[in-house]
Amino acid sequence: MLALGLLAAAFASPAGAAAPVSLHDSFNSQQAYAYTARIAAFGERWPGSPGHRKTEELIYQVLQKDGARVEADSFTASTPRGPVAVRNIIGKFNVSADARQKIFILAGHYDTLFQPGFIGANDGASSAAILLAFADALAGQKTRMQIWLLWTDLEEAIHSFDNDDGLYGSRHLAQTLAANGTASRIRGFFLLDMIGDKDLGVARETGSDRGLQDFIARAARQLGYSQYFFQYEIDIIDDHVPFIRAGVPAVDVVDAMYGRMGPSFDSMGEFHHSNADTMDKVSQHSLEVVGRTILLTVEMLDR
């Protein structure tokens, strides 16, 4: 396989010219880890907090550096804590004038649980950070589809997840895109959640689009990462659900076993929604596995 790749590159590139680097090979896991550490160091990141504002500033800074078209979906959510200002941030790459151009969305939330002392190194920081590394990889890359990087806000429930509490940002944006007709152009939606876990194991989420999951499995197999994907199943309420309800093919790329499992712990592991969700639980290797696999999947779907 390596020899064939080198042969193809030799024929594709003029003498002395470097072969173009693929999207998935442009992913920098060291930078993704550094972004994760930086966001986690901001501390608590519930909407309105200093850490939340610093995270927003970092997202805007990176997107502007990488040449994205930056948009915000801002609104006031009615929550059990009262009105909360919410801002989804979207970085768009390779936008053409063709109104029929397909869209692919890579998403993750950047808020944290309303819990004093909770920094969410994995649950919030890792997903926000890997999207920043995706922005760096996409800078200068050409794709047929528009690629949207979406940072959702107020994913976490105030009390407990139900139809009215939790997923505030994704519910609002999905409803907006369905109402204005954009949802029909979305080729797919990948949500990344808690993907920095040192003991990485991405679940096969049973409500997600099986065809898109199969593309992810193919990409993982090609890269030698199959052992990290779809070895167990789970049904979960997450930011992909409002998009599924809007008719968008969506997959939750989630590690749903964070730490030890058992009756003494949270249903998603001992570190989930725990103040022990800190940087020592996050791995650069896990970010590399997920980042390269997801970007290779996007390349496959863009052909």
Model segments located where?
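N-terminal capping segment at the start of a domain
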Residues: 18-56, 66, 111-112, 192, ...
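Structural recognition of the beta-strand scaffold that forms the well-ordered cores
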Residues: 72, 90, 103-107, 148-151, ...
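Acidic/histidine-rich catalytic neighborhood of metal-dependent amide-processing enzymes
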Residues: 114-219, 223-227, 235-240
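Proline/glycine-enriched tight loop/beta-turn segments at coil->beta junctions
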Residues: 96-103
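A non-catalytic alpha/beta surface segment that caps or lines the substrate-entry region
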Residues: 34-94
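Active-site-adjacent substrate-binding region
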Residues: 78, 188, 197-303
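Bacterial N-terminal signal peptides
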Residues: 1-10
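Soluble non-cytosolic domains of exported or imported proteins
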Residues: 26-33, 46-57, 121-129, 164-168, ...
